[in-house]
């Protein structure tokens, strides 16, 4: 079963003014779509791999044939990362988490503000292209960043919040002002979705 581009859970202009309509359209229909197309192309001659989930492929890259390993890493990672990214954004987002996730953030980072600062630093400090992440690792929250389209899944960690800091994610609106894009991100985080992913990751 070939992988498919997921539909966005909101219109392309829904995240304005924080992320502009044109960026969302190009990011979803061109960039993400290309990762899906190239992932399917890499798996084409390998029917034994076509029934595996994205998580199964990415968590065990070493088991893949060397000839397609890099293509699956880059394009499978890109597909996984963006599929998560769209769901943790919402036009009704922002604010702060509540409940179990809020408690875990306060316990691990001291406060929500301290968490935001550390996450923002990880995003701003990622040289070149990549992602900043809040992950669950052995039941614990952790902030990390990955280069290119690498996914925390490749390291055995479960991502629950991610921020794309590739220039294609923000350049049309913010140009080289990555910190402004990072600051705007907090206005559209869907904390209900992040909390749901946190509960699921803890139950693994």
UniProtKB/Swiss-Prot annotation:
The keyword Acyltransferase does not apply. SUPFAM superfamilies: Fe,Mn superoxide dismutase (SOD), C-terminal domain, Fe,Mn superoxide dismutase (SOD), N-terminal domain. Its EC number is 1.15.1.1. Mn(2+) binds at residues 27, 82, 164, 168. Binds 1 Mn(2+) ion per subunit. GO terms for cellular component: cytoplasm. Keywords: Manganese, Metal-binding, Oxidoreductase, Phosphoprotein. Transmembrane segments: none annotated. Signal peptide: none annotated. InterPro entries: Mn/Fe_SOD, Mn/Fe_SOD_BS, Mn/Fe_SOD_C, Mn/Fe_SOD_N, Mn/Fe_SOD_N_sf, SOD_C_sf. The modification Phosphothreonine is found at residues 34, 70. PANTHER family: 37S RIBOSOMAL PROTEIN S26, MITOCHONDRIAL, SMALL RIBOSOMAL SUBUNIT PROTEIN MS42. Destroys superoxide anion radicals which are normally produced within the cells and which are toxic to biological systems. This is Superoxide dismutase [Mn]. It comes from Bacillus caldotenax.
